[in-house]
Structure formats: C-alpha cells, structure tokens
C-alpha cells in the first residue's frame, strides 16, 4: 500500500483486509469481575425479570475476549437464575477476540478476581491457563458485529445492555450515535450500564439512575 488513498480504498472494498486491520487496531483490556458492583446490579435486575418466567436477554457490547460475558454467567449461576431463562450475547468488531471468546481459555491475570472456590467450579485447568466450563453457563452466543452496522438491529431486543469503557475512544457525535442506536434494541424500561470512565452525553431517550451499586440508564 503506497498511499493513504490506496489504503482507504482497500479498507472500503476489501472485507478481509478491513477485518484484519480492525483486529490489529482495536484495544482489548479486560478481566473477570471487572467493576463488580455493576455486574451484581445487572444480575439482580435480571433475576427479578426472570422470576416472571420470561427469558432475560443481555447484550455485552463490546465483549472483548469474553470475560464480562462469562462473569455474568458465573454470577447468574451463583444467585440461582435458571440457565434456560437467560441469554447473553457478546458482540465485538474484532473477529480474533470473538474466536477467543468461543474458546474460553484465560490466563492467570484474567481470573485474578475469581475466588479459588469459583475457579474449581467454573474452570478446568489447562496447563497454566483456565478454560471456562461452558456447560455450566446460561445460553451464550458471540458474534462479530460493528455497532455502527445495521446488523446490530438483527439481534432483537434486550433487557440489559453493558457497554463499558468503549465510548472513551469516541468523540461527542459518535457517543450520542452509540446511545441512540442502543436505544433501538433496548426494551422499554431496560437498563444500560456504561463504564466509569465513559462520558455519556445527555439523551432524552434515557433516565439516569444513581443507585448504591452504581449508575445506570433506564430507557423511557
């Protein structure tokens, strides 16, 4: 590639090149039970919804390498949510990360916040790593999706969305676009949790709720 013009053209028309470049430049930094208060809040709400007999749908966007999704699965099992009443979808623009999610193998650093008793229940030791026991998890799926692509809307409607520490990389216009797009796939009175570092723009589609376990946004 000998010029920026050539690069832009190849990015636009070559799907394989575009995905490889996105995989290279996206940032992935996460671990199990990160910002645990928010995860607990989300799962307590999911538990309340599941009691009615409905299947609760949760979206993690972006899901990075899967630690957040599996953390929710562990918490759901811990508080007794029926695994068949909960479906968690993880999406990410990085296809390499989605493959890692599906493999479910993590190093010691990723599981540093997992209690030893939980490691013994939910993980299988593979050499120096830990492999999640997916048979103990609720319904989980991972997909390579760009939130600014309309394939997002094919996922259906969700009760809870977690999108933590993604918007810190966006400007004001893209932050607003992000929460407007999420509103289209969030059920009425559904909750969305952002990261503590995210700058969330005002949007009349949500009410900001400040709770003892942390802040979330409720669709109005």
PLM regions: where:
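Conserved class I S-adenosyl-L-methionine
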Residues: 54-66, 71, 89
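Short hydrophobic/aromatic beta-strand or adjacent loop that forms the aromatic wall/cage
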Residues: 211-216
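Conserved beta-strand signature within the Rossmann-like core of class I S-adenosyl-L-methionine
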Residues: 188-196
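A short glycine-rich, Lys/Arg-flanked "PGG" loop and its adjoining helix->strand segment in the class I
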Residues: 176-188
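A structural alpha-helix within SAM-dependent methyltransferase catalytic domains
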Residues: 43-47, 70-73, 77, 183
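Conserved AdoMet
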Residues: 1-59
């Amino acid at each position: 590639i000998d010029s920026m013009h050539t690069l832009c053209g190849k990015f636009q028309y070559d799907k394989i090149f575009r995905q490889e470049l996105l995989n290279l430049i996206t940032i992935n930094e996460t671990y199990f039970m990160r910002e645990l208060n928010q995860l607990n809040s989300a799962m307590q709400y999911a538990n309340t919804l599941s009691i009615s007999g409905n299947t609760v749908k949760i979206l993690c966007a972006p899901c990075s390498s899967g630690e957040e999704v599996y953390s929710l699965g562990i918490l759901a099992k811990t508080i007794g949510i029926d695994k068949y009443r909960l479906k968690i979808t993880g999406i990410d623009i990085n296809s390499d990360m989605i493959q890692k999610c599906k493999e479910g193998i993590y190093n010691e650093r990723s599981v540093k916040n997992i209690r030893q008793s939980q490691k013994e229940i939910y993980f299988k030791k593979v050499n120096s790593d830990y492999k999640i026991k997916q048979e103990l998890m609720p319904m989980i799926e991972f997909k390579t999706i760009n939130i600014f692509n309309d394939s997002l809307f094919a996922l259906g409607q969700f009760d809870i969305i977690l999108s933590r520490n993604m918007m810190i990389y966006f400007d004001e216009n893209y932050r607003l676009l992000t929460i407007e797009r999420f509103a289209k796939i969030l059920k009425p009175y559904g909750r969305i949790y952002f990261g503590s570092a995210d700058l969330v723009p005002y949007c009349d589609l949500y009410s900001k709720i400040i709770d003892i376990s942390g802040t979330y946004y409720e669709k109005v």
